[in-house]
Design a protein with these regions (language model features):
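Cytosolic covalent-transfer regions centered on His/Cys nucleophiles
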Residues: 21, 30, 37, 45-46, ...
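Flexible, glycine/charged-enriched surface loops at secondary-structure junctions
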Residues: 26-34, 45-50, 64, 105-118
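Residues forming anionic-ligand binding surfaces in small-molecule and nucleic-acid pockets
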Residues: 71-72, 147
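Single conserved hydrophobic/aromatic residue that forms the stacking wall/gate
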Residues: 140-152
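A generic, well-ordered mixed alpha/beta core segment in the N-terminal half of proteins
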Residues: 72-136
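Metal-centered catalytic cores of metalloenzymes
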Residues: 22-25, 40
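Charged, compositionally biased N-terminal leader segments and the immediate start
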Residues: 1-23
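Translation machinery proteins
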Residues: 40-65, 121, 125
Length: 152
């Protein structure tokens, strides 16, 4: 049986890029939907609001800054190959380091607290990520609802 080896740094780098990109770039499909909504809007106020949202999205992409001040929590849905081995670290540690780097290096709002019930101390890097894992045959990829990132 063939074993697939993936370096922890590859997982980390992929997660960092995924989270940075999804906070800076809205996606062509959503931009198209916003433009269509603006063009079909009959209310001048509604048209103006949609135009401002579109302009904000263009600025975020051009200047690589977050689309919104609330950049949310890191939630991943991972399909993890049954014959995959992570080298030089663990999968969870690599994912959390990627999230950490994205939120720190990408200037994303860090709002996760370590213990939401008692101490409520901000982790200052938006970790730990919430990782939903499903074991699948032979391949690994990390995705969020509108984007996929495959690790080769």
């Amino acid at each position: 049986m063939e074993i697939r080896k993936i370096k922890a740094q590859t997982v980390c780098d992929t997660v960092k890029k995924l989270f940075t990109d999804c906070n800076y770039f809205i996606g062509k499909d959503i931009m198209c939907a916003l433009e269509t909504a603006r063009d079909n809007e009959s209310s001048p106020v509604g048209k103006s609001v949609l135009s401002q949202i579109i302009e904000n999205d263009k600025i975020a992409a051009r200047e690589e800054v977050p689309l919104c001040q609330d950049t949310g929590m890191a939630v991943l849905f991972v399909e993890y190959g049954d014959r995959v081995v992570i080298e030089d670290g663990s999968f969870d540690e690599a994912v959390n380091e990627g999230v950490r780097r994205a939120y720190i290096d990408g200037y994303l709002r860090k709002s996760v607290v370590n213990d939401p019930v008692f101490d409520r101390i901000n982790t200052k890097d938006n970790t730990p990520a919430i990782i939903h894992t499903k074991i699948v045959l032979s391949l690994i990829h990390i995705s969020e609802p509108t984007r996929r990132s495959y690790i080769s």
